[in-house]
Amino acid sequence: MARGPKKHLKRLNAPKAWMLDKLGGVYAPRPSTGPHKLRECLPLVIFLRNRLKYALTGNEVLKIVKQRLIKVDGKVRTDPTYPAGFMDVVSIEKTNELFRLIYDVKGRFTVHRITPEEAKYKLCKVKRVSTGPKNVPFLVTHDGRTIRYPDPLIKVNDSVQLDIATSKIMDFIKFESGNLCMITGGRNLGRVGTIVSRERHPGSFDIVHIKDSTGHTFATRLNNVFIIGKGTKAYISLPRGKGVRLTIAEERDKRIAAKVAGQ
């Protein structure tokens, strides 16, 4: 009988968003337990080795993190399989680089560099609002943070702008029609658009209808929607493509136009 946590992850079973080649070995780095789920995170070893190419092997990544050079959300992380996830700020002081982990329109974590000003805060989705012992109100965010005494206007599915240094709420964005959101799950992963409407289905999944900046509409489940801005103004910078997914034909036309312009 198996006892205790699983310690291995087969390469074929690793999330597609990690973009590991399936013939590169039998196993993949299994993320440690932490603030993000296994299938929604990116271990530091993959970010440093496969994305940034700062190391060739896992052993080199271990040597980098053990020098206490890598910070996630302002805290030094020395575990190479630490699960960094959506909206986390990864900072490397030695190279003066700052990154925010965010999805591209193909649903993969992209290397998205940000300014020092933007690296001071992150957005967190509110997962739960409740009262604790002695009637102290608190909320729980998507990355496992518990924040006591929040603004009573903050409800589930809203987003809070969190100061990383102090873990204090700077601002919050309501979940309502007309606000900008990013999709964090399902087949529309990584797309950005404004909320059009919300269909309530008690006992089942609420459906949210979203319209992107090119006028395309799509729908997804409520728990896949992450509010990132008031109106059309995003609180964070977006990666290349601005969260607009092109159809295959549109991608082809864009490539041909670029080729013609380059000749």
From Swiss-Prot:
Domain S4 RNA-binding stretches: 42-104
SMART domains given in the database record: KOW, S4
Annotated transmembrane regions: none
InterPro entries in the cross-refs: KOW, Rib_uL2_dom2, Ribosomal_eS4, Ribosomal_eS4_C, Ribosomal_eS4_central_region, Ribosomal_eS4_central_sf, Ribosomal_eS4_KOW, Ribosomal_eS4_N
Gene Ontology process terms (BP): translation
GO cellular component: cytosolic small ribosomal subunit
Domain of life per record: Eukaryota
Molecular functions per Gene Ontology: rRNA binding; structural constituent of ribosome
Keyword terms: Ribonucleoprotein, Ribosomal protein, RNA-binding, rRNA-binding
Any Pfam family the entry gives: RS4NT
Gene3D superfamilies the record matches: 2.30.30.30, 2.40.50.740, RNA-binding S4 domain
Family, similarity comment: Belongs to the eukaryotic ribosomal protein eS4 family.
Entry-linked PANTHER family: 30S/40S RIBOSOMAL PROTEIN S4, SMALL RIBOSOMAL SUBUNIT PROTEIN ES4
Name of the featured protein: Small ribosomal subunit protein eS4
Organism: Spodoptera frugiperda
Lineage: Eukaryota, Metazoa, Ecdysozoa, Arthropoda, Hexapoda
